[in-house]
A protein has these predicted regions:
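Bacterial N-terminal signal peptides that target proteins for export
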Residues: 2-20
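Compositionally biased regions
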Residues: 7-12, 49, 240, 434-435
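A short, solvent-exposed, low-complexity linear motif enriched for acidic/polar residues
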Residues: 33-305, 309-313, 338-400, 406, ...
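C-terminal functional regions that serve as terminal interaction/effector modules
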Residues: 350-352, 409-423, 428, 439-442, ...
Length: 468
């Protein structure tokens, strides 16, 4: 549909970056065919064949507050050898559907596998059925459909040389891919300039960040277990990730051992090992195979009923057709212990707190949450009966003001979705020793922050995990 948006809206949309860190599920380099998603009988880490390197595909996006949903499917992916020859195909999961705004300011694992060592001069992508939704100044959702299919070849300059375990990052600038006529948005058109491709080796386990191997708040259903390893089907992305464990791995909330994980919906925290394989430091149970979880943005609250726009989910009744749909969630009767904070890495304990509260009285429209339920997810627009409500990290962007040693304010743009939804114009940000800061924060400058967003009854308070 066509939609009139302001220049300010376009500048906000331009900040949206759709990122694939190509943890390449390279169908064993030279040519496995077929779609992904099948689980091997033995989910243990696959030995790296001679002449190949363990690599990882991740996805994410940079915060863009005006955008409340961006969905896309990856139909094909390959790398072109610099010396010539056929492109090396990357096997992507069948029927994958990726929603990116929930990963604002963060890279998330997509798939893992083995990539042939060598030098590559281009990446080739086919993206299908892209969709973008943002809020107008009056709070009306504006939906833009992209092309049914878009194939793009992105030159790599300089060439990409793969010689050891690696994380490949592909940033897709959605703002640069929007077409307009007379100030009216009329479509999405991906071009080579939409993409920036970089690469990093896995970082030291204790200090990893999202772009060099960190595993933070990765959710899915365990589809196979073997010995000390398990395989996780991640959300609606459809990808399968295999994790190793050992005696240091912590099991929580109803899961006690690897053997107890089968068919469970879980959250995993961990890191990428030096050889490129994945290790689980913590595994937390969410629901049994009769339940589900749905992640999304609270767009409205009426009494005790939340309206949630779904970003992702897993479990009974959840499928890719429900990504982007709205659901109602009635929190009446939930005890204080049912409201939790999904802190992940870098926040420590002690949340929620008096300064950073999260309960039935301080939950607020504009926050990202995860709804855990013991029942199946209903059809779109249906009512989800919650068992637990978990606060999740989200991205916020704007202009810096009142900078101090460990605090600053973000002034939200007039068309910011958070501002429109909540009616608030400022977010107060607190940093700590674990905040991953990649840019200089100065009054008057633009900033993109990912963290936990709390409502204290009068104002927004955010603890920053990342500043970009």
């Amino acid at each position: 549909m066509n939609a009139q948006i302001s220049r300010n809206s376009l500048s906000q949309v331009a900040k949206l970056t759709f990122t694939f860190a190509l943890v390449a599920l390279i169908a064993l380099a030279a040519g496995c065919g077929g779609g992904g998603g099948a689980v091997a009988n033995n989910p243990g880490p696959t030995p790296t064949p001679a002449g190949t390197t363990s690599t990882q595909v991740r996805f994410g996006d940079a915060p863009a507050d005006s955008v409340i949903a961006f969905e896309v499917s990856v139909s094909s992916l390959s790398l072109t050898p610099a010396a010539g020859g056929a492109p090396i195909a990357v096997t992507v999961p069948a029927n994958n559907r990726i929603e990116l705004t929930h990963a604002s300011g963060k890279f998330e694992p997509f798939v893992t596998g083995n990539l042939p060592q060598g030098t590559f001069s281009a990446a080739n992508l086919t993206l299908v059925n892209s969709e973008l939704t943002f809020l107008s100044g009056t709070g009306t959702p504006v939906h833009i459909n992209g092309p049914a299919s878009a194939s793009i070849t992105v030159p790599l300059s300089p060439n990409l040389t793969i010689s050891g375990p690696l994380v490949l990052n592909i940033d897709v600038n959605v703002g640069a891919s929007i077409t307009t006529a007379g100030g009216v948005v009329n479509g999405i058109a991906f071009t080579p300039t939409s993409f920036t491709i970089t690469a990093k080796a896995p970082g030291a386990a204790a200090n990893q960040q999202d772009d060099d191997g960190e595993i933070e708040d990765v959710q899915g259903t365990v589809t196979a277990v073997s010995g000390s390893s398990f395989t996780l089907k991640v959300g609606q992305a459809g990808s399968s990730l295999t994790f190793a464990t050992d005696g240091t791995t912590q099991f929580k909330d109803g899961v006690t051992t690897v053997a107890s994980l089968l068919n469970q919906v879980v959250t995993v925290e961990g890191f990428t090992q030096a050889d490129g394989s994945l290790f689980a430091k913590e595994v937390e149970g969410l629901e049994s195979n009769t339940g589900a979880e749905v992640e999304g943005l609270i767009t409205a609250i009426s009494g005790t009923t939340l309206t949630v726009n779904a970003h992702d989910g897993i479990g009974s009744g959840m499928d890719d057709t429900k990504v982007g749909a709205s659901f109602s969630v009635n929190i009446a009767g939930l005890s204080a212990s049912k409201f939790r904070v999904k802190a992940g890495n870098g926040f420590g304990g002690g949340l929620p707190s008096a300064t950073f509260p999260f309960d039935a009285t301080t939950i607020h429209q504009g926050q990202r949450i995860e709804v855990d339920t013991n029942a199946a997810v209903p059809p779109a627009s249906g009512a989800i009966t919650p068992d637990k409500i978990n606060l999740q990290q989200q991205g916020v962007s704007g202009t810096v003001a009142n900078k101090a040693a460990s605090t600053f304010d973000i002034n939200l743009a007039t068309d910011s979705a958070l501002r429109i939804i909540s009616g608030q114009t400022v977010v107060h940000v607190t940093t700590n020793s674990s905040t991953d800061t990649r840019v200089s924060v100065a009054n008057g400058g633009s900033v993109q922050v990912r963290g936990l967003l709390f409502w204290n009854g009068t104002s927004w308070q955010m603890i920053a995990r990342r500043i970009r």
